[in-house]
């Protein structure tokens, strides 16, 4: 009847209004947390880099940042097929501790342009040369164009692909430093084969990054790691239960203890008398003041969850606040970003729920009325009859059990079919192990 249709539409209107209010309130809540209740300003920036590429980033600027009160800066990069927003939680925590953050959208991600290289290995070429835009963004942000940035305290970090970009960026300036020192030692330089103070200062001025923390990217040659180009404080963060653990000698994600990669990474900056044969997780080695600091973090986290796992976020906070000597009353354990996660989840669920009343109201519009069924179709028997309902739920549970059992059965099969990919080696199939598992 017409009255029933009218009542249903009114009910949908009320439901939709309630859901829209929930979305609005949750979004405002997330925004307040992200800006530390108005104490942090966020803004989007866009720059043009070499080869006429566009690179975008979101800046998180603490309220107290000014030309008279310069603040440290951390530049972040997401992983492959991820969004710059994934690092917003880390940015929220660092910025409320007085550190400006630039959440970069790497080339071919978000609204940034594509990398200019062509061919099958274009992604890897760019990661190992341009850092997917991180080098260009670092050059821009440390050029002095932003008067509130302390260019003597600039850090870089990123996850997975972003971790490789972090290695690339910090080592890019390290190689420039090495070249300057080599030039200063040439016989035709100002001081001859001896390095003058001015030559040393000129070389040190090329080190635009002063602290680096690659995440989910162990210090191996495959990730572009070159210890000879590291002249600043560097850490490495790997989840203790990462899926990419087969990339290291332990064949697990463990790079502390007696892991070769961890020992070599720590010893790379230590003198012969200081070298170690066992690495403690979360322990500082070397010296912050002379830029020989090294540390390895192994929080309980899988690979992709590192930027949102509390233990990992605390480690990231601890590293940069320590390297930059940030005096803040906010401890690394005081985290507010989970509230933003909650608000985001509420807004998302409300948005999904709003699709039902919205679609019903749209179908009531004259232009879409022909798409609406003349009468409501009968319910599925399984939802009306108890006996059929029992069969239905038994089928659902049985189907789930079959999925679990077959997953365990296909894992060994997957390792046999894709032996190279299972240990992180690129193949003619897919170069990421989970993709091959889907095939099997």
List each language-model region with its residue ranges:
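Membrane-embedded alpha-helical segments in integral membrane proteins
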Residues: 26, 30, 324-333, 406-412
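Soluble extramembrane regions of membrane proteins in the secretory/endomembrane system
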Residues: 42-336
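Context-gated lysine
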Residues: 7, 36-41, 70, 118, ...
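An N-terminal hydrophobic leader/cap segment in hydrolases
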Residues: 8-48, 56
């Amino acid at each position: 009847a017409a009255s029933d249709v009218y009542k249903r539409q009114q009910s949908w209107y009320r439901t939709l209004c309630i859901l829209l209010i929930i979305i609005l309130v949750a979004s405002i809540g997330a925004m307040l947390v992200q800006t530390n209740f108005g104490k942090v300003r966020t803004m989007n920036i866009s720059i043009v880099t070499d080869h006429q590429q566009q690179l975008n980033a979101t800046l998180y600027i603490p309220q107290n940042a000014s030309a008279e009160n310069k603040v440290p800066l951390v530049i972040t990069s997401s992983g492959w097929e991820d969004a710059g927003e994934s690092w917003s939680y880390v940015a929220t925590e660092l910025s409320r501790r007085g550190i400006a953050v630039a959440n970069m959208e790497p080339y071919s991600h978000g609204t940034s342009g594509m990398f200019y290289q062509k061919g099958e290995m274009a992604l890897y070429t760019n990661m190992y040369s341009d850092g997917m835009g991180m080098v260009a963004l670092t050059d821009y942000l440390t050029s002095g164009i932003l008067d509130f940035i302390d260019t003597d305290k600039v850090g870089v970090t990123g996850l997975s692909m972003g971790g490789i970009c972090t290695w690339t960026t910090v080592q890019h300036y390290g190689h420039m430093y090495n070249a300057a020192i080599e030039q200063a030692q040439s016989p035709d330089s100002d001081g001859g084969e001896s390095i003058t103070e001015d030559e040393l200062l000129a070389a040190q001025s090329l080190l635009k990054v002063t602290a680096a923390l690659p995440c989910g990217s162990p210090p191996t040659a495959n990730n572009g790691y070159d210890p000879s180009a590291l002249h600043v404080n560097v850490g490495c963060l790997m989840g203790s239960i990462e899926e990419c653990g087969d990339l290291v000698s332990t064949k697990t994600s463990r790079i502390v203890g007696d892991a070769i990669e961890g020992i070599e990474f720590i010893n790379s900056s230590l003198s012969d008398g200081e070298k170690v044969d066992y690495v403690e997780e979360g322990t500082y080695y070397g010296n912050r003041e002379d830029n020989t600091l090294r540390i390895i973090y192994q929080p309980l986290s899988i690979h992709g969850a590192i930027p949102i796992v509390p233990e990992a976020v605390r480690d990231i906070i601890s590293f940069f606040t320590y390297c930059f000597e940030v005096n803040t009353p906010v401890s690394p354990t005081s985290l507010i970003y989970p509230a933003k996660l909650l608000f985001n989840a509420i807004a998302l669920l409300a948005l999904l729920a709003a699709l039902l009343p919205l679609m019903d109201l749209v179908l009531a519009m004259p232009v879409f009325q022909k798409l609406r069924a003349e009468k409501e179709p009968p319910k599925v028997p399984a939802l009306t009859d108890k006996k059929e309902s029992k069969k239905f739920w038994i089928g659902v549970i049985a189907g789930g059990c079959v999925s679990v059992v077959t997953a365990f059965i296909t894992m060994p099969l997957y390792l046999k079919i894709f032996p190279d990919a299972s240990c992180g080696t690129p193949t003619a199939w897919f170069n990421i192990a989970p993709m091959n598992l889907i095939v099997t």
